[in-house]
Amino acid sequence: MQLLCYFVILFVGIAPWSSLANDDGCNEVVCGSVVSKCLITQSCQCKLNDCHCCKDCLNCLGELYIECCGCLDMCPKHKDVLPSLTPRSEIGDIEGVPELFDTLTAEDDEGWSTIRFSMRAGFKQRVQGGASGDAGNGNGNGNAGSAGVTLCTVIYVNSCIRANKCRQQCESMGASSYRWFHDGCCECVGENCLNYGINESRCRGCPEDQDQLLTADTVPAEAEQDLERFFGNEEIEDEWGYGEEDEFS
């Protein structure tokens, strides 16, 4: 009787995994252990069209999300899936060293691409509750611009790296936060940035089939639009804009 119970339990535990293992994009060798864990913890017990468990599932699969989401039927099936239902990156805070980060990002480097864009005063006020003049009171570092304009500095590592390596590299550079994308792209974010920098994978060499390379002309506007969407203020005019817009034309 005990032997029969054992086989029943074994079958119940393996049957769901066996049916899922044949789904498109499921690497059984790589995903076996982590998928079993997520099944046991029931971290992925929902559908993309009702994704109340997406965050838990993402955390459970971790850096293997792209490789293993097919095993749990959690990969987007269409390109028009809502971005909120398509986890693209992992974020984290670091005990930053702004002076070090500003020094390292002041000049171009073979290992990363540096992007700077101005943060408008309205965003700082809505999120941090500061006065309009606070945004421009820089302490002499490379992230404070003239006329009250605060510059956000981010760097994109040129090569693909894993999530833990991304955090380590950003920490060693003195960044205040980081964003690691599930295609292997790593973004280190300076102290004056909101919403963990730019929510878009823009590493030059990662992934290899990337269609659009990083261009300084497009980043400021797109980064601002990303923040507009995040705070739901696409139609709201801020008190003032970038300042001297000619610099960005």
From Swiss-Prot:
Keyword Signal present in the record's keywords: the answer is yes
Q: Which GO terms describe its molecular function?
A: BMP binding; endopeptidase activator activity; heparin binding
Q: Classify the main location.
A: secreted
One GO biological process term is:
negative regulation of BMP signaling pathway
Q: Which residues are glycosylated?
A: 199
Q: Which UniProt keywords apply?
A: Developmental protein, Glycoprotein, Secreted, Signal
Write down the InterPro entries for this protein, in alphabetical order.
Answer: Tsg
The reply to whether Glycoprotein figures as a keyword in the UniProt entry is: yes
Task: List the GO terms this entry assigns under cellular component, sorted alphabetically.
Answer: extracellular region; extracellular space
Which Pfam families has this protein been placed in?
Tsg, Tsg_N
Subcellular location per the Swiss-Prot or TrEMBL entry: Secreted
Q: In which tissues is it expressed?
A: First appears in stage 4 embryos, expressed in two domains: a broad mid-dorsal saddle and an anterior cap, expression between the domains is continuous across the dorsal midline. At stage 5, expression is refined into 4 graded stripes in the mid-dorsal region and a paired domain in the anterior region. During stages 7 and 8, anterior expression fades and the mid dorsal stripes are located between the anterior and posterior transverse furrow (ATF and PTF). Expressing cells become incorporated into the deepening PTF.
Q: Which residues form the signal peptide?
A: 1-23
Q: Tell me the subunit arrangement.
A: Component of a complex composed of dpp, sog and tsg.
Protein family: Belongs to the twisted gastrulation protein family.
Q: What does this protein do?
A: Involved in dorsal-ventral patterning. Required for specification of a narrow strip of dorsal midline cells that will give rise to the amnioserosa, but not for specification of dorsal ectoderm cells. Inhibits BMP signaling; enhances the binding of sog to dpp, thus enhancing the antagonistic activity of sog.
Query: What's the protein name?
Result: Protein twisted gastrulation
Record organism? Drosophila melanogaster (Fruit fly)
Q: State which gene encodes it.
A: tsg
